[in-house]
Each structure stands twice: as C-alpha cells, then as structure tokens.
Swiss-Prot record:
Organism name: Vibrio atlanticus (strain LGP32)
Cellular component aspect of the GO annotation: cytosol
Protein name in UniProt: UPF0301 protein VS_2679
Any Pfam family hit: DUF179
Family: Belongs to the UPF0301 (AlgH) family.
Amino acid sequence: MNLTNHFLVAMPGMKDPYFQNSVIYLCEHNDEGAMGLMINAPIDVTVGSMLKQVEVDSEQPKPNQASLDKPVLNGGPVAEDRGFILHKPKGSYQSSINMTDQISVTTSKDILMVLGTEDEPMHYLVALGYAGWEPGQLEIELTENSWLTVEADPKVIFNTPISDRWKVAVQMLGINAAQLSADAGHA
C-alpha cells in the first residue's frame, strides 16, 4: 500500500489533539515511513510577514498583496522551522518534486523570491513543519481507525477554504461528516 498523493483525514476520535480534524497531504509513503503536510491548520502568520522574518526580498515588485496576506499553515510537529510550499507546477526551483501534474512541493528558498510577484505559482500554500511516521507507524494508526484515506484532489488543497477542507475531504469518501462517529470498530 502506497498512499503518496493521498489525504489522511483525521477521524473524529483522533487521540492526538495535535491532529484533531486535520487533513494531511501525503508527500511520501514507502517502506521507510511517511511524510506529509497538514493543509488545514493556519497559524497566526501571513506569507508576507514570514517573508520579512526570513529576510527574503526580491527586486521584483509585489503587486499581488492578496497572495501575501494568505495565512501560513502549520504543516506538522517535525522541523517546525522548515518551510514547504505546495503549489501548482510553474517555474524551476532548486528543490522541487512534482507529485502530480497539478501538485509540486518545493523546499528551496528560491521559490520564496517570487511569492507575491507575477512569477508566483497560480496556486500555492506555505506550511512550516511536517508530519512524519516511522516505518509501519502510519499503517498501525490506519488499523486503529485514526485516519481515513482518499486520493488527493488539488481543488481541496488550492481552492477550498481552509476551514472547509476536513469536511470536503470526508465528503470525497461519500460520507456525511455530521454522521461520522468518534467510536470506530472493526467488523
């Protein structure tokens, strides 16, 4: 089972309060473990203020103020000072991986130079930190009914309001979120 390019959707009974109601985009899942980014946990920092904090300033004018006003997301509890940009593929950056033809993840600072400019990706989100699992750990959590899984949809990442992403991800499974029980069992 490889869940790369899938969403992990926290079940209502999630034991870890850090991940309650979270939606995680899995960037990698293999025999060595898993790595993903929470896509619905905004922090009290905007993209523009983050760029000032990391002293990124390009010579290009920043005409897209709305882009700079977007919130930065809490990507997860590991390496919280490390930035990850999920974006529609556009441009060439030092450290980018095309997950699909509609989703790339970039970790290099060069993408930060274009945020807020006409050269920025059409859709993007910035996350600090990531969620990580040791080999077999995610599989155990799946058998404990901590997570639902569904193939990732770029529209949920880039076009769905942050506060609606959990509900929309649940609906992708054909489930009414209001009827999802915190009590899970096995048949």
